[in-house]
């Protein structure tokens, strides 16, 4: 198994996924360890200068003017973690929680947060030994960072809170245990937080970035899958390949459109079905937009998803603590890097971009099941009337598309003041992340429905064969789901194709 060396500078989104899914380990890079030592030394030195330093020897938020006696500084950090662990709702799924731990460790490795080596080492040891904090999803407004989610992570470090014990490679369901018990079972000891450490752990954008990164990577795969689903539908509807010609795309110059059209051309190459309806015998002049404009719509989605990638690729290596500790200049400086606006905006874009992959997919399903549009039996049903075929599969897709329209209302346009007005503009970045995650989940299901219905249409076009890559995808799908010869409970078929998608079984 690969071991990633965290330095706060070079972590990639794909590496985040690898650690989140247990496919890679993480350790602290030697150079990063030295930076951590130096930043901690500066914090310790500042404790002796008699000055007020925010979050080190003062209260927090609107209580920043309150000086804390030296004897109470450890208690101050513990109280910060305890008081901020006010999250509610379902726990983050294990991959997202592991990504959260990884991202917090990575940004601490930058050496500008004043954390001790021991505390950072415990964070990484928790990842290594499968101690995954129970982190409620809700309760963050995205500035001052994701306070509540990160506080629940920090609880486990001090032997409090709850954690799942899920060692990498272990069989069975993870155990949910008190945090101290999970550490003990893993052979680890909690830490007593020193000045600045509680703040270094809870102040940052890593919860929204963790959820957003995994949603983004899934959306990127679905953007390619949307081309495959569209190609399969196009073949089933005897649609034209001509709108995907490179000269059309070049005349506009949008990069996502050019990439989507190239992918569609590759998927559709060598189609017997296409050859069968060329020439004078074909009465179609133009296909509906949901077929003809796939490069434009899928391409715009790719571009929006790409924008989100750029923001998150920077954010996973970003110092979002406050104050920041700069050993080279000897300064400890308060700022606003904890504000999640860049991530919130990007995740809203991700949700909107991905939603269009489902919206156009549902319209293609309508083309397939409507006999006046497809020339095929109503709802692709054998003995229609007695059988309803894929009638309600299309309704399910429509329901998810409409749900996405609600979810795509941007979280990042909202703000609500907190902390007695000191924190008077916030990002709602975690809300954007959770919404984007659900939108992407709905897109996956809509594309699975389209693939299921399009496969039936291809069956009905036999013996003519579709393009080779479409035929290969059809064959893989048929290994999981048989042809619909009479009505059956379609939810099982939808789940089977969805699982095939999640496993990457249709990535050609």
From Swiss-Prot:
Top-level taxon of origin: Bacteria
Cross-link 5-imidazolinone (Ala-Gly) residue location(s): 143-145
Chain positions with 2,3-didehydroalanine (Ser) modification: 144
Keywords recorded for this protein, A-Z: Cytoplasm, Histidine metabolism, Lyase
Subcellular localization, as worded in the UniProt entry: Cytoplasm
GO molecular function terms listed in the Swiss-Prot or TrEMBL record: histidine ammonia-lyase activity
BP GO terms, sorted: L-histidine catabolic process to glutamate and formamide; L-histidine catabolic process to glutamate and formate
Protein name stated in the entry: Histidine ammonia-lyase
Species: Anaeromyxobacter sp. (strain K)
Taxonomic lineage of the native organism: Bacteria, Pseudomonadati, Myxococcota, Myxococcia, Myxococcales
